Amino acid sequence: DSEKLESELNIYFIEQGIGWKLVNGNLEARNPEVLEQTIQSATIVLQEAGSQTARGELHEALMDLSRRPEADITGSIQHAIAALECVFRDVANDHKSTLGELLKRYPDMIPAPLNQSIEKLWGFASEYGRHIREGRNPEFSEAQLVVGVCAAAVTYLIGKKNI
């Protein structure tokens, strides 16, 4: 059976120190366990909330981290921020504003001073993920950080919406 084969291959990959895993027949890069759990939790929350667009963006962020031979680092940052922006728009019921505008209009959506960290994340993503300049390439670990923080923020915002 395919699930058993997938499980056995993943165990083998771990035992051999191979940084890959098989997920639903697709080979993906293995990320740090805490990042994997954060993304998985966010994906489930988004699925249950019916936020398919944000879920798709988060999935694309993960796929971009897994691309080989070179990860699409800027793509992962862009998709992670897009997921966060999509959820923020939905929770704020403001479907036209950018994430930067939403953060200014709804400063209490994320409690201070945590809201400042999201503003800084937005700035980082704008600088390194969207409007990248020659010689200023983000690192893989920075992309993982952005994806993880966005996944956690998405989970928080969906929870806030459901209160």
Q: How would you name each of these model-derived features?
A:
Residues 45-48, 52, 67-74, 112, ...:
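Short, solvent-exposed segments of well-ordered alpha helices
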Residues 55-62, 73-92, 151:
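Short, hydrophobic, well-ordered secondary-structure elements
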Residues 56-67, 121-131:
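Solvent-exposed, amphipathic alpha-helical segments
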